[in-house]
Amino acid sequence: TLTLEPGLYTVEGWVRTQDVATTDSRSGVRLCLDARPSGDWWRCTEVARGTTDWTRLRVAGIPVPERGRYKVWLGAYGAPDGTAWFERVSLTAAGKPPLDVYLLYPNFRGMLFDDRSQTVRAALGVAAGTGRVKLSLVEETSGQARISRAFEVAPSLTAELDAGALPPGRYLLRAELLGPGDAVRARYPDHRVVKLPARARERLNAWYDERNVLHLGGRPAFVLGLYTTSGYSTSRSTYARGADGWGTERMAEAPINMLINYHLGRAPMPALGVYLDELHARGMRYLQTVNFYHRGDAQYREIDYPAARGGEEELNHWVAGTLGAHPGLAGFYVMDEQPAEMVPTVFRQYRALAAAAPGSVTYGVLGDGRESQAPAWRDALDVMGLDPYPIVKPTGQNDLAMVGEWTRLGQDAVKRSRPVWMVLQYFPLTAAGGWPTEAELRSMSWMAIIEGARGLLYWSFGEKGLAWIKDPRQREHKWAELVRITKEIKALEPVLLAPDAAVVSRESSGGRVRTLGKTTPDGARYLFAYNTRTTPVRVTWTLAAPATETFDLATGRPGPPPEGGAITAELGPHEVRRLRIR
C-alpha cells in the first residue's frame, strides 16, 4: 500500500507462467493499481495465462485524481490453476514538466480571425518554485517578439495577450519560465497562432468558434450523428437504399448531420466520393475513419492506397488532401478508446491531417476504462468524445448520470475550450440491460447536453446496433424512438447554440440537480435540468431575474409557477426537465 499524489502512473512487471488457467481459459494472472476501498476503481494489465517465458505486463497513464492510499497488487484473475512467477514489479509516476501550457483561445487550430476576439488566452501551470512566466507572440519567420508579458508564478493561471494591433501572419505563442535575473529555466513547445481575415473561413468546410459551436458550410450546428457500417459502391442509389433498405434514405428521417462509417476507412476513393455526394445532398457531413493509419496497426498493411507505401505521414496527407476538397467532409475519426501511450502517434497524425485539410476537425473517443486519461489527449484532438454505456441492468437499476459525469470529464480535460461530442448507447450492451428505452435514451441525451456537450453521436445504426435487430417491427420501433428524440433536440437547436446564461442564481439540491441556462434574443429564458440520483429530489431554483410563467417543453403544459422569484419542482430518478421561462 502506497500514498500517492495526483498524477499519471505506470504499473509494470515481468511474469513467467506455467500451465496457468488450463481449466478455465478466462482466468489468469495480472498486475493492478487499486484505489479500493476509499475509491471505486482499479486499473489492471492484460491477463497472462498458459505457459510463457518472461513477459512484460504494463499499463501506463493511470490517472490518480487525488492524494490517498492505493494498492499495487499482483495475483489471480478469476480462479486460475498453475504457477506464475513475478519480478521487477514497479509503479512509476509520470514526470510533470516544470511549465505546462494549454492554448485556450484561439481554440480552432490556432486560427485568430480578425472579426473575433483578439485576446490570446493560455492556461499556465508551474510544477513548483517561484519566479515568473513570460508569454510572448513571436513572428514565425523573423523570430522577433512582437508582444510580451510576464506573470508571477502560480500553480495555475490564465494568461492573456492582446493581439489586436498585430498584422495578419503566422506567430508563435512562446512561454518561458524565468528564474533569478530573468534567466530562462524552462520553455514549453511553441503553439502556432495564425492571424487571418474573417473571409478565410469561407474556405473551411468545418470549424468551431470560441463557444465550441461547430460551423458546417458557414452555418452553426448542433451535432447529431450516427455511427454506422456498410459496404461501398459508386452508385448513390445503393447508399440510399442500403443493403436491406436501411441506407441513408432512412437515416435522413432523423435530423442527422454527422456520420461515421467505420467500415470505409480504406474504401476506394471513387466510392468515397460518391458516398460524400450522397451524404452532402441529404445535409449530412462525414468523418472518415483513419484510426488505423499507423504502421503499428495490423490493418495498415491492408490499405491499398499507393500513398500508404510512402509511410504514415504521406498517407494521412494524401487522404486529407483528397477528401478535404469535398464539401461533405467534416473531418476524420482518429482514435477509438486508445491508451495514453498513443498520444504522440495520434498527434503526429493530427498535424498531417490539419496541414492538408485545414477546414476539417479530428475526433477521438475515450472509454472502456481509459476515460480518466482524457487530459492527456487535449492537444492531440480537435474534438473530444467519450462513450459512457451505463445500461447493463434492467430498466431502473442503471446509473444514467454516468453520462453527465463523463461529459464533465471531457469538459474539464479541455478546460471547456474545445468541443465535446458524446457517444451515447444505442445498442444492447448486455442481455440483462437490453436496448435503452426511449426514456433512457432521452435522459442520456439531455444529460450530456446539460453538461455542455456540443454534439451527440449514437452508437450504432449499423452492426451490433440497429442493423442487428432481427425482428422488423422492433427495428422500426427502436428507430422511431431515436427519430423522435433527435427531432426534439433539433427543434431546440437555436436555443442550444445560444450563449450559456445564468438563469438561476441559487438552488437547493446541493448539486444533486444539474442545470444549464440559456437566453434567446426574444427574451425567453430556458432552464434544462436533470436529477443525478436514483431517488426523487425536490429542488427550488431562485431565478436570476423575475418571471411570470414557465412552460414545460416536454409535456406542452404550464410548468411550476414562479413564486417569490423562485420555482420548485419534483424530479424523479434521473428525470430531465426542460422549461421555458418568461
Indicate residue ranges for each PLM-predicted region.
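Aromatic/acidic polysaccharide-binding cleft in carbohydrate-active enzymes
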Residues: A432-V483
